[in-house]
A protein has these predicted regions:
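Conserved C-terminal structural/oligomerization subdomain of aldehyde/semialdehyde dehydrogenase
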Residues: 241, 339, 346-494
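Conserved glycine-rich cofactor-binding loop
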Residues: 12, 19-20
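ALDH superfamily catalytic-core signature
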Residues: 181, 214-356, 419, 476-481
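Hydrophobic ligand-binding cavity/cleft-lining segments
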Residues: 492-537, 643
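Beta-strand/loop substructures that line and gate deep hydrophobic ligand-binding cavities in soluble
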Residues: 573-624, 631, 640-641
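Rossmann-like NAD(P) dinucleotide-binding subdomain of oxidoreductase/dehydrogenase enzymes
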Residues: 113-250, 376
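N-terminal Rossmann-like NAD(P)+-binding subdomain of aldehyde/semialdehyde dehydrogenases
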Residues: 26-122
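NAD(P)H-binding Rossmann-fold N-terminus in SDR/SDR-like oxidoreductases
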Residues: 21, 25
């Protein structure tokens, strides 16, 4: 296949339809892949696993080549950083897919509605067809091949468009894919910005894009012309929230690692840190020591990565110049860029203090080794600061308070969260990875990635007896009876409560009956008379849990009144169902016996739940209860009489 080159830019030209002419080589390639997909059908489990094995073996065989190519593309990049951040993460992901693929492919059974209960319902996961993958320059190997591995696992074919900013890596991807797969299975397309726009405008079955929010808008606009579903993995300003009183030596080192890996050119890199106003100086000291421990020679260290090119380097310098001009205090760690003479476009680890929203550095995604510090007075201020900005791709929280952690998790919205660390949620293969709002939508990794590249086909299998046929014309008395029964059940359980009252006289003192009645270990046996209900043994009266065997709905109960020894009441709620049971105890005139009155009401929206709580069954439950009390405390003088 003839190869050209593509530029990764802040804006792409908009290409609609097939009018540009640039797609004349792309559209036939897409057509060949789609024809092969339709001709051969979905690949089997064995074929998908074989493709994953081929990809993994090819990667490991070219490891040294990729390390050299990325070093050349960045001006300098540690081979260990490439091996860890790209090769290792990618092979872990492939191994995860290989291991779990059988489970992912398995059809999922679903519930069948009552009139057709003898039928079968399931969801089957079907390959979409041809997946388009647009990869960025910051991790050009893993961010091209991780979605490819997921697409292959889901049974698809794929076309990849890598970035022009990393030409050596792009050329290596071309040769690796050509040696491993046929062109109608996987192909790599290179070209300039116009080719990239034409690629995004192709009628793929799904388009996966990783890159900036600005380009993501252009890609989505182009895909919408063809009604192509998209997954957008974008960026954003991912905050680090450091709770007060944390061990700053460890915290600062963890933040420095997340910020300085790949020189901050990571979509989930910490973009700014929120510190309590009393801890800024201590953090700066801890940061300086942490950076020195990670990179003893500062930006001249062998393990420290350069900025990808002069253009991006100058953009970062422009952010710092703008911040200085507007009153920020800039603190560089290690030699300044001018003294890092061993390599070009290398930026020192940098802190920026006294920042405000008028600065570009607080409005734009930084994507470099520059970390602004924002101070807060209390946690609510910090959370409000995060929520006042577009939703980020990641949030990082350092803290030991369970309550504060829960506040951060529930009151902020982000693509993902790592607690007491940075970056690490990305490499958890069983967790979905994706953005929200301006940081993207859709997710990959885990079963979510497999399903993103699959069509979730609903399959309903009608068996020999079909209850739905009873509701076909000609309508008559049977139809009226069925409708009357079904609609009455729904009405009864949604609005009109079921009410049951029973009473019995137990030959025992009121104190003795009270003790037996509130002994929660006895309660499960009372419900044996109701075959739809199982009451699990509770540990205490306030933690009773009802479980309906016919449906995984839980009805949790709590004691709402306990006036010893006259009155005891519990309520139960779940899925719109509300139940209330009150036990009233009063002694007979001579005090030798006790009258026990049970009054229960049930109301809820589910028809089957109404059947489970029909009055006769509740009467049977009460009868069982009274018999148990009598056996333990004396004889029943007038047992289980409905009143």
């Amino acid at each position: 296949m003839t190869q050209t080159m593509i530029h990764y830019q802040d804006q792409w030209p908009v290409v609609t339809g097939a009018s540009s002419g640039l797609d004349r080589g792309l559209a036939p390639l897409l057509a060949r892949q789609r024809a092969a997909f339709l001709r051969n059908g979905p690949p089997s489990l064995a074929e998908r696993r074989a493709n994953l094995k081929k990809l993994r073996a090819a990667l490991l065989a070219r490891r040294a080549d990729f390390e050299a190519a990325l070093d050349a593309d960045f001006g300098h990049r540690s081979r260990h950083e490439t091996a860890i951040m790209e090769m290792l993460a990618l092979t872990w992901g492939i191994d995860y897919l290989h291991k779990n693929l059988r489970r992912f492919m398995r059809p999922e059974r679903r519930r069948v509605s009552l009139p057709m209960r003898f039928a079968r319902a399931r969801v089957e996961y079907q390959p979409l067809g041809v997946i388009g993958i647009v990869a960025p320059w910051n991790y050009p190997m893993s961010l091209a091949l991780t979605p490819l591995a997921t697409a292959l696992a889901a049974g698809n074919r794929a076309m990849i468009k890598p970035s022009e900013f990393t030409p050596a890596t792009s050329d290596l991807l071309v040769s690796l894919i050509a040696e491993t797969f046929s062109e109608d299975e996987v192909a790599v397309v290179t070209g300039d910005a116009a080719v990239g726009a034409a690629f995004a405008a192709l009628p793929f079955d799904h388009l996966f894009f990783t890159g900036s929010t600005a380009v993501g808008r252009t890609v989505m606009r182009a895909a919408s012309e063809q009604l192509v579903p998209v997954t957008l993995e974008l960026g954003g300003k991912s905050p680090v929230l450091v709770d007060r009183g944390q061990p700053l030596a460890r915290v600062a080192t963890d933040i420095a690692y997340g910020k300085l890996a790949n020189a901050g050119q990571t979509c989930v890199a910490p973009d700014y840190v929120l510190l309590h106003e009393s801890e800024v100086e201590a953090f700066i000291e801890a940061w300086t020591k942490g950076v020195a421990a990670l990179y003893p020679k500062g930006p001249a260290s062998e393990d420290y990565t350069s900025i990808v090119n002069v253009r991006h380097y100058e953009r970062l310098r422009g952010l710092l110049d703008d911040a200085r001009a507007k009153g920020a205090h800039v603190v560089e760690t290690g030699p300044s860029p001018e003294h890092a003479k061993r390599r070009a476009h290398t930026l020192a680890p940098t802190l920026v203090l006294d920042v405000h929203d008028d600065m570009r550095i607080m409005r734009e995604e930084i994507f470099g080794p520059v970390l602004p510090i924002v101070t807060y007075r209390d946690l609510a201020d910090a959370i409000g600061f995060v929520n006042a900005r577009p939703r980020p791709l990641a949030v990082y929280y350092f803290g030991s308070s369970t309550e504060n952690r829960r506040q951060v998790l529930t009151r902020t919205t982000s693509g993902g969260v790592t607690i007491n660390g940075t970056l690490l949620h990305y490499v958890q293969d069983d967790l979905p990875f994706g953005g929200v709002g301006a940081s993207g939508f859709g997710a990959y990794h885990g079963i979510e990635g497999f399903r993103a590249f699959s069509h979730q086909k609903a399959v309903f299998d009608v068996r020999r007896w079909n209850g739905g046929a009873l509701l076909r014309p000609p309508f008559g008395r049977l139809t009226n009876f069925i409708l009357s029964f079904m609609l009455r059940q729904a009405r009864t359980t949604s609005g009109v409560p079921i009410e049951v009252r029973n009473a019995a006289v137990i030959h025992a003192s009121i104190e003795r009956v009270w003790d037996l009645l509130t002994d929660v270990e006895r309660w499960p046996s009372w419900w044996r008379a109701c075959r739809w209900v199982r009451l699990e043994p509770p540990t205490r009266a306030a933690s009773v849990v009802f479980r309906w065997k016919a449906h995984p709905v839980e009805l949790r109960s709590a004691v709402v009144k306990s006036d010893r020894p006259q009155c005891f009441a519990i309520t139960a709620d779940g899925r719109g169902v509300h139940a209330e049971r009150t036990f009233t105890l009063r002694p007979t005139p001579d005090g030798s016996s006790t009258v026990v009155v049970s009054h229960e009401t049930q109301v809820g929206p589910l028809p089957w739940l109404g059947r489970a709580f029909l009055a006769p069954r509740l009467h049977a439950v009460n009868q069982t209860m009274f018999e148990d009390l009598a056996e333990a405390a004396g004889q029943v003088i007038d047992g289980g009489r409905a009143i």
